[in-house]
Amino acid sequence: GCMKQALADAGVAREQGDHTNAHGTGTHMNDSCETAAIHAVFGEHAKQIAVVSTKSMTGHLLGGAGGVEAVFTALALRDQFAPPTIHYEQPDPECDLDYVPNVGREMSMTYALSNSLGFGGHNACIALR
């Protein structure tokens, strides 16, 4: 899929991924599928990646969501700070990654992905350094 292709296009090994700004709509359908995709792409390394949903703070910006979330991802890299996934209250057993629940944190990161998928069939991912 697009995450694997973004990593390949950027010349980044899956073990180098530090942070992913997920599409993260907070729905079972999206979040469980996106979690499974992250596991498929990153393997055992998936558990070490800070996976956040900035959509939890902005709401769904429809056509603007991908651009705004890419900016959030660039700022996270610049500031070495993973923003929180706010309103994270009831973990889904199928969603077993580090979602940075409710409180952001400083962390060392070199590479990050920003995912955008859904409405209209778009499916995009950008790798940033």
Give the location of each predicted region.
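Conserved "HGTGT" condensation-loop signature of ketosynthase/thiolase-family condensing enzymes
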Residues: 1-129
